[in-house]
Amino acid sequence: MQIDKKCYAGHVAPFVVWVGVIFLLQGLEWAGLCPRALYPWSYAAKTVICAGLFVWLKPWRIYPALKVSNVPLALLAGVVVAVVWIVPEMPWLGRVAPGVQEFYHRWCIMMPGAYPSYYNPSFYPALPSGHVSLSYAPQEAGWGLTIMKLIGSACVIAVVEEFFFRGFFYRWLRSAKFWTVRLASFDMQAFWIVVAVFGLEHDRWLAGMFAGVVYGWLTVRTGDIWAAALAHGLTNLLLAVYVIASGQYGFW
């Protein structure tokens, strides 16, 4: 029973706390009680808390270490997902194929049928004045909180999500004692359920599903949870660097 509790807690608790903070902010925003400064500060706080939970609960104890032979494939997967995530929203695509970019923003980002709040085709990629995503920019939050956003995205939530979705959820759909299911064993139904849930967890649901396919395939292909975490972390790192360099804080 003790092993069961530790396995569940280590895989689930950090993710639940992370998502819980998101829902809390949404509730405060709906009630008009969420000052702009709370967004970057809450992100920094949940980064520290969830990293601490992960280290304390040690869910990695039931997995072997990252295999060096899996690193090249993981890095390639991370780059591919980053490219697919970023390119549809790059300014040059709006100049070359504005209809394609408008379609992507209208139908491939939550909620389908309406433009996301950060997108206005008349002055994109600039954000609407005072948009909440700008609260993460160093000009407003300071470099410390902007870097914490990068660290949390690339080093904390990427790992937490992989341990939850690929380490726990994918196998739990097949057995309550999920740790007894081999990561490398493929189950079609479980795979696509995880892809769908993972995609819908993100506002960019189509890119999220593509990422779910790639990270899920990598996990099954290698049987290595750390390969998926490395790929996911690299994707988020590349995205964060692009956001800061380009000023497209709508991604955040």
Model-derived features: positions:
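Juxtamembrane helix-loop-helix connectors linking adjacent transmembrane helices
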Residues: 63-157, 171-183, 249
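Short, Lys/Arg-rich, polar N-terminal cytosolic tail immediately upstream
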Residues: 1-5
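Alpha-helical transmembrane segments and their membrane-interface junctions
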Residues: 21-24, 87-104, 201-210, 214
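Transmembrane helix-loop junctions in multipass membrane proteins, especially transporters and channels
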Residues: 30-31, 58-63, 90, 94, ...
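Alpha-helical transmembrane segments in multi-pass membrane proteins
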Residues: 7-83, 99-107
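Transmembrane helix-loop-helix hairpins at the membrane interface
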Residues: 84, 132-252
